[in-house]
Structures are given as structure tokens and as C-alpha cells.
Design a protein with these regions (language model features):
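Short, flexible/disordered intra-domain loops and linkers
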Residues: 77-82, 192-194, 233-237
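N-terminal pre-catalytic "stem/leader" segment of glycosyltransferase-like enzymes
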Residues: 1-39
Length: 313
């Protein structure tokens, strides 16, 4: 298997699919940074902003106006670590951090887009938006069947201008049609929701340099996220319970997204909670029901003093 996947709960999407020797397909930014040195500059978020004429500069350069958005120039762990809005010069002076930068505070829809790229030309798109909750957490992601022609045109032009010669998958995060982050990989949280044969098409893109995927049966999907309070050491639910839930109509897959033998602090998590599970589905009602049952199962696996998980939203 040449698909580099660090999270064991996501290997289910790639196991058993043949992949030629010598082909490296990243799902982790650290791998992509190593494997694609010519294009690794895109992990510099300050460079991404400047490539589009977005007002931005390293900490130490005072913004001409507030509020601004501040974050690390480079963060390969994700989860929005170190990101925040800075509202005033006084707050900015107190928040100065080496390796961070500020950028103008963008407005508009926040979209995550997976793109297949052939030699610097975007040839396939799929878009998703998150339903946020406090503290950088999410209730769910909606993976849309519909295209976004205006966004695709703008991002396609940027890709052609800045990634000549690149062949592979990309993930772009945009706000109001402007790119805030770019990744040399796809979103490995929901590849099953893209349809049968999609992973094989990705392998073909890296192996042969050609994207070949009919994509004739698109349907909107949902990636339901289960968060709980940070701090406790959670345990996995029983395998039999998981197997039964995976068989429910409308459910595509279930991920238990933590290592129960790790100290909780080793996991990269947003400030608002600890992510326990993800339910991918095409039926929103079924996904909500299975997520609720997962919450109960995870609570039953815990010690009595933290059974409050049963009441978590």
C-alpha cells in the first residue's frame, strides 16, 4: 500500500485496493512536504495570502487596521492550532508570537475543496462546508454533489499560475472565494462519500498522470463528528457494537478517531473538545441516530465518573 495514511481508523478506505510499487500518495501534510519538494512552498500560509494580494505580514509588522486573523505561517498538524482573531493594537501587542503572521479578516462562505490536478490543470472538484460549533469543533461536514463554477474558475486559474507541472490531489480551503490554505493531498475524512472507484482513480492519477473517473452517481453526503470534553482517557466501544452500527441503512463508514492507549494530550485537537468518532453517511437522519448511539456506547465503555458523556451534545 503506497497511500501514506497515519491514522489507523482511515485505513479502511484504502485496504485491499491494488497500488503499483513506487507510487507515493500522501494523506498527511508532513508526507506531502517531503515527497513534493518543488511545490512544498504552498504550506507557507503567508505566501498563499500574498500570492492573491491579500493583506498579510509576519508578526512584528503592525497591521494597518483591525480586526485581523492570526495563525502560524506553517502548521502541518492541522486542527486550527494557534489560530485566532485579533481585534485591536493592544491585543496584537500581547499576542506577538514568533513564526506567526496576520492577514486581513476575510468574510464569506468557508469551503473545503478537493481537486484532482493533471500537470497544473484542475480536472475534478468536490466541495464541502462545515457546520461549526464552539471552540473550533464541528457538528458535521456537508459534502455537496453540486459544482461551484465560480469558485472552480478562480481556484483553477490560481492552480494553473502557481502549480505548473504538478500532478496529484490537492485540498484548498477558501473563505469568500479566496484561498487561505492549500494542501498537496485530499481530505481523508470522507473518501468513501465520493463514490465507488474514486480511490482507484486517485491511484491512477499518481501512477499514470491521468485522471479517469466517470463520477456519474454523485450524491450529497454528510460527515458527522462526535466531540466530547477534553481531559479524560476515553475507551473504544465494543467491536460488535461498531459492526452493527456500520450495517445500518444510509451509513457509509464509522471512524473511532483516537488512540485509547495514548495520553489524551498526544492527540492534536481543537480547544473546544476531544474528537471521538466520525460517521460518514448519505442519510442525515441515519447519521444523527448512529452518532447518538455511538455516544451511548462510548459512555458505557468509560469509568462511572465520566459517564456524563451520555449527556454531551
Amino acid at each position: 500500500m503506497a497511500i501514506g495514511e497515519a491514522d489507523p481508523w482511515r485505513l479502511q478506505y484504502f485496504e485491499g485496493i491494488p497500488c503499483p510499487d513506487g507510487i507515493d500518495i500522501p494523506t498527511e501534510d508532513a508526507d506531502a512536504w517531503i515527497w513534493f519538494p518543488q511545490h512544498r512552498w504552498i504550506y507557507d500560509k503567508l505566501a498563499i495570502a500574498q500570492s492573491q494580494g491579500i493583506a498579510a505580514a509576519p508578526h512584528g509588522v503592525v497591521p494597518p487596521r483591525f480586526p485581523v486573523f492570526s495563525k502560524p505561517m506553517m502548521n502541518l498538524r492541522g486542527m486550527g492550532i494557534g489560530s485566532r482573531v485579533i481585534a485591536s493594537p493592544q491585543e496584537y501587542a500581547a499576542a506577538l508570537t514568533p513564526g506567526h503572521f496576520w492577514m486581513e479578516l476575510l468574510e464569506g462562505e468557508h469551503i473545503s475543496t478537493d481537486v484532482a490536478v493533471e500537470n497544473g490543470r484542475a480536472v475534478w472538484w468536490r466541495h464541502a462546508t462545515g457546520i461549526p460549533r464552539p471552540g473550533g469543533t464541528f457538528d458535521r461536514w456537508v459534502i455537496y454533489a453540486e459544482p461551484r463554477p465560480q469558485l472552480e474558475a478562480a481556484c483553477g486559474t490560481w492552480i494553473a499560475s502557481h502549480l505548473a507541472g504538478y500532478t496529484g490531489m490537492m485540498n484548498l480551503e477558501t473563505i469568500g472565494g479566496r484561498i487561505i490554505e492549500a494542501h498537496l493531498r485530499f481530505a481523508d475524512q470522507w473518501p468513501d462519500l465520493y463514490g465507488d472507484g474514486w480511490v482507484e482513480a486517485v491511484i491512477g492519477l499518481y501512477a499514470n498522470g491521468v485522471w479517469s473517473y466517470a463520477d456519474t452517481a454523485r450524491s450529497t453526503g454528510f460527515s458527522m463528528v462526535l466531540f466530547a470534553p477534553s481531559g479524560p482517557r476515553y475507551r473504544h466501544p465494543e467491536a460488535g457494537i461498531l459492526a452493527a452500527l456500520r450495517e445500518r441503512s444510509g451509513i457509509s463508514s464509522i471512524q473511532i478517531t483516537f488512540h485509547e492507549d495514548w495520553d489524551p494530550s498526544r492527540h492534536a485537537m481543537p480547544p473546544g473538545g476531544f474528537r471521538l468518532a466520525i460517521v460518514n453517511c448519505h442519510d442525515l437522519g441515519a447519521g444523527r441516530a448512529v452518532r447518538a448511539e455511538l455516544r451511548e456506547a462510548l459512555a458505557e465503555a468509560m469509568q462511572p465518573e465520566i459517564l456524563y458523556l451520555k449527556g454531551a451534545a
